[in-house]
C-alpha cells in the first residue's frame, strides 16, 4: 500500500470555464466553511450528517461531476466528498488513482479562507478531521439533489 496521507488542494477560482459542469456545480452548490474548504450541503434525510467536501479524484473512481463518496482513513476518520473536478489522467498513475506524490483526494478550497497550517504544509492531512492514509473510497449510489 502507498502512503496516501498527502492531500493536495486547489483554489476553486482555478476552474474558470463557465460552461463546464465543474464550474457550474461549484457556483450553484459550493460555499466555503470556516476553515476554507469548499463544501456542499449534506443530505440529512439520507443519513449524510456532515456536509460534503468538494473534491477532485482520478478517473478510476468515476468521472461524473456530482458523484458522492464516503471516504475512510486508517485513523478512523470518515468524511464525505462530492466530485467537482477530475484529476488529469496524464498526471496520475497507470490506474488513474493518484498523482506523483501519492495524493488520492484533492480538496477544492478557498485559499483566502484556508487555515494557515494547511497552507504551510501544502496538505490537508494536517487538518485532523481529514488526517490519515486513505483506507477506502466508497461510491454512494444516490444522486445528489442539492441537499434538499
Residue ranges with predicted function:
Residues 1-148:
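Solvent-exposed, well-ordered loop and adjacent helix/strand elements within mature globular domains
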